[in-house]
Amino acid sequence: MSNRMWGGRFASGPAEIMEEINASIGFDRRLAPQDIRGSLAHVAMLGSRGILPAEDVAAIEAGLKSVEAEIERGEFVFRRELEDIHMAVESRLTEIVGPAAGRLHTARSRNDQVATDMRLWVRDTLDALDAQVADLQRALAETAQKHADTVMPGFTHLQSAQPVTFGHHCLAYVEMLARDRGRFRDARARLNECPLGSAALAGTSFPIDRHATAAALGFDRPTANSLDSVADRDFALESLSAASICAVHLSRFAEELVVWTSAQFGFVRLSDRFTTGSSIMPQKRNPDAAELVRAKAGRIIGALTGLLVVMKGLPLAYSKDMQEDKEGTFDALQSLSLCLAAMAGMVRDLEPVAETLKRAAGSGYATATDLADWLVRELNMPFRQAHHVTGRVVAAASERGIGLEDLSLDAMQAIEPGITQAVFAVLGVENSVASRTSYGGTAPDNVRRQAQAWLERLGPVEK
C-alpha cells in the first residue's frame, strides 16, 4: 500500500522514474513563502467559519510559522518523494503539530493551492520588476538631461538619417519602458483575483468565505468560476508577454551598445564594471553585459512560447502539464530582473564620445532633409520638388566626395538658382537639431524639458 498523502487507493508506490518525472520540489520550492502565506490565510478562514476548532487553528498557525522559520534559516529538508512544496510543507507541519495538520487541507485542493501560490509569486515579482524598470527609466532620463546637447546620428536602416541628440535617443527608451510598466500593471490588475477555495475544480460543500481569504492575501476579489480558477494560467502568459516585450526593448538598446562600443563606431565607452577581457587578445574590452542582455531576451521570449504551447491543447480543468508553467516563468522573470539591473548600471556608467558622435552626425548627408525644408520655406517650393532638388544636390556632393556643407554655392545654384548663402546655416548638425522644435522633437530644449518632466514623474530612488 502506498503511504503517499494521496495513496489510499494505491497498492504500491510509484516507479523511481515516475517519482523523478513527477516531482517539482526541485523548482517549486521557491513558492514556499507564498504557500505558507496562503495556508495561513486559509486556516484563519476555516477557523472564523467554525469549520476547524480554535485549538487546531492555533496549532496549525504556530506550526506553519515554525516551518517558515526553518526554511528561512536553511534548515528545512526538501525531499523529492514528497513531490512538491505543498506536500513538503504539510509533511513537516504534521511532524511538528501532529494529526491536526491533516485538517489544513479541508476545503482545499493542490489545484487551487498552486494557482494561488503562483499568482502571489508573479504578483510579487511584477511589483519588483516595476520598480526596476522605473530605476532604468530614471537612469536614462538623467543621462538624457546631461546629454541634451550632445549631437549624434539618428539612423534608419542603420544608415545615417538625420541628426538627433544623445539625450533624445535615451528618452526614446524611457517611453518604451513606460509602456512596459503599463503592461506589467495591467497584467497585475488582471491576476489579482484569488483562486483559493475553488478546490479541485467544482468548489466545495464547506461554508467557506472566499472573500475573506482573498482580502487576507491582498487580492481584489475571489475568482468567479471554480473551473477557470484552476485551469487558468493567463496570468503567467500575460506576464511573460509583457516581460518579452520589455526584453525586446532592452535587447535593442543592448545591440546598440555592442555596436557603438566597437572600434568601428566608437560612439560610447562602457565602464570596466560592465566589460570583460580576452584570454588571448590583451587589447580587448568586450561588452559582455550588453551581449548577455541581448541573449537573455531570447530566453525570456522562449519561456512565453513554451508555456503557450503547453497550454494550447489542455481540456478543462487541471492537467499535470500545467506543472511546466513554473520553471519557465521563474527563469524568465528573474532573467528580466537581472537584465534590468545590468542595463541600469551600464547606462549610469556609460560615456558618450561627443566628438565622434558629432562627426558621425554630419556624415552620410544627414542634413539633406534640412536642405529640403529650407527650399520649401524660403523658395515656396512643393516638398516633392524640394526632395528632388535636394537629391540632385546630394548627388553632386557625393560625386565630389564632400559633405553638403562643403559643396560650393555655385554648385548648388547650378542645380537650383534660387539657393542663397543663407542655406549654409541649416546644414550644420547643431542647427539641424535645434530646429526640430515640434512636440517630441530632438531640439535640446525639448529634450531638457522632457527629461526633467520624467524625473519629476519618476521621483527619487526608493531606498
Curated annotation (Swiss-Prot):
Enzyme class (EC, first level): lyase
Subcellular location field: Cytoplasm
Entry keywords, A to Z: Amino-acid biosynthesis, Arginine biosynthesis, Cytoplasm, Lyase
Pathways involved: Amino-acid biosynthesis; L-arginine biosynthesis; L-arginine from L-ornithine and carbamoyl phosphate: step 3/3
One Pfam family of this chain: ASL_C2
Amino-acid biosynthesis is among the record's keywords: yes
EC number, UniProt record: 4.3.2.1
Catalytic activity: 2-(N(omega)-L-arginino)succinate = fumarate + L-arginine
GO molecular function, one term: argininosuccinate lyase activity
Single GO BP term: arginine biosynthetic process via ornithine
Gene3D superfamilies referenced in this protein's UniProt entry, alphabetically: Fumarase/aspartase (C-terminal domain) (1.10.40.30), Fumarase/aspartase (Central domain) (1.20.200.10), Fumarase/aspartase (N-terminal domain) (1.10.275.10)
Primary location: cytoplasm
Entry-linked InterPro entries: Arg_succ_lyase_C, Argininosuccinate_lyase, Fumarase/histidase_N, Fumarate_lyase_CS, Fumarate_lyase_fam, Fumarate_lyase_N, L-Aspartase-like
Entry GO terms, CC: cytosol
Family indicated by similarity: Belongs to the lyase 1 family. Argininosuccinate lyase subfamily.
NCBIfam families: argH
Name under which the protein is recorded: Argininosuccinate lyase
Gene: argH
